């Protein structure tokens, strides 16, 4: 069962400025925390479309929210197909869209999914379990140079080269099959003094591999642009990010769509295609309160940004 503590619950949903009869999208259903709070604010004409790649998350939510009938619609899909899937449902615009980019706790805590460095399990890390690429493929098939690049770019790991060398040497004799084996190699690649600070030594490499397996940054960038197009004027987009790479994409995308580009002087009117699409609701990200951080340690790196369609 999905026992998932939702991060920035009220701030994210209230930030959408809910219209009770509106149409909303939860791009990251997960344990259904945001969906539950959002559904409770809708009247009979309102509806929520919830996306998730995980079949278990979809089935749990269908049971949990069965009393809402046709007000609650699930879509088993990566949110990169947001626009296409909504159009298949006959929906061309919506009143609000939310993204919570954290891996849901049930996925992290289910050992066989291979997301966690706390459990020994097969190397998997796929959000969509029908997807072809796994963490096993990345760790055993990708070149030293590719591993260094993703560890550094996606994990911001200072010891990327040392860790990649350990992996390269080990797999010459035997495939790396489990998260436990990978954790040991990561530890060997990080100098002892550095292992004692900054949380679990495998955290950054596991993040990097997960991002690579699921193509998370490119997917998010595409989906955020689609969300901005799909939201009607006055509608909002709420985004919770959990690391600097995601936050940078969100911040840059919101900023680019909320500013007027440099135009030749003397234009009598600004053409529509150059007018800002968004108004920033949050100039700086909203962070979890001290109370929330005490109750849920996983919220510590969360940042919420909200923008409104002009």
UniProtKB/Swiss-Prot annotation:
Keyword Ribosomal protein: no
One of the protein's GO biological processes: rRNA base methylation
GO MF: rRNA (cytosine-N4-)-methyltransferase activity
Residues reported to bind S-adenosyl-L-methionine: 32-34, 52, 79, 100, 107
A Pfam family the protein falls into: Methyltransf_5
Gene3D superfamilies: Putative methyltransferase TM0872, insert domain (1.10.150.170), Vaccinia Virus protein VP39 (3.40.50.150)
Record keywords: Cytoplasm, Methyltransferase, rRNA processing, S-adenosyl-L-methionine, Transferase
InterPro entries: RsmH, SAM-dep_MeTrfase_MraW_recog, SAM-dependent_MTases_sf
Residue ranges of the TM segments: none
Record localization: Cytoplasm
Catalyses which reaction(s): cytidine(1402) in 16S rRNA + S-adenosyl-L-methionine = N(4)-methylcytidine(1402) in 16S rRNA + S-adenosyl-L-homocysteine + H(+)
Xref: HAMAP family: 16SrRNA_methyltr_H (MF_01007)
Family designation: Belongs to the methyltransferase superfamily. RsmH family.
NCBIfam families (UniProt xref): 16S rRNA (cytosine(1402)-N(4))-methyltransferase RsmH
Name listed for the protein in its UniProt record: Ribosomal RNA small subunit methyltransferase H
Species of provenance: Bacillus cereus (strain AH187)
Gene designation per UniProt: rsmH
């Amino acid at each position: 069962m999905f026992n998932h503590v939702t991060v920035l619950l009220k701030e994210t949903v209230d930030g959408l400025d809910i219209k009770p009869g509106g149409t909303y999208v939860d791009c990251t259903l997960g344990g259904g925390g945001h969906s539950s709070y959002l559904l409770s604010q809708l009247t009979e004409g309102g509806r929520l479309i919830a996306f998730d790649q995980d079949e278990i998350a979809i089935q749990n939510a269908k049971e949990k929210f069965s009393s809402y009938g046709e007000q609650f619609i699930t879509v088993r899909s990566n949110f990169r197909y947001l626009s296409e899937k909504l159009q298949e449902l006959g929906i061309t615009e919506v009143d609000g869209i939310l993204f919570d980019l954290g891996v849901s706790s049930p996925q992290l805590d289910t050992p066989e999914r291979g997301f966690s460095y706390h459990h020994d399990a097969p190397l998997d890390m796929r959000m969509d379990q029908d997807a072809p690429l796994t963490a096993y493929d990345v760790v055993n098939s990708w070149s030293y140079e590719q591993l260094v690049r993703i560890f550094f770019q996606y994990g911001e790991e200072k010891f990327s080269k040392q860790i990649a060398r350990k992996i390269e040497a080990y797999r010459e004799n035997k495939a790396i099959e489990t998260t436990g084996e990978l954790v040991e190699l990561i530890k060997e690649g990080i100098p002892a003094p550095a292992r004692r600070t900054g949380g679990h030594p495998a955290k950054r490499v596991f993040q990097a591999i997960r991002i690579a397996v699921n193509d998370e940054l490119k997917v998010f960038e595409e989906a955020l642009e689609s969300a901005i197009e799909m939201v009607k004027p006055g509608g909002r987009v709420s985004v919770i990010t959990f690391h600097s790479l995601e936050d940078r994409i969100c911040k840059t995308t919101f900023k680019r769509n909320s500013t007027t580009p440099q135009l030749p002087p003397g234009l009598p009117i600004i053409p529509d295609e150059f007018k800002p699409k968004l108004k920033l609701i949050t100039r700086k990200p909203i962070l979890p309160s001290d109370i929330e951080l005490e109750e849920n340690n996983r919220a510590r790196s969360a940042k919420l940004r909200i923008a409104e369609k002009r």
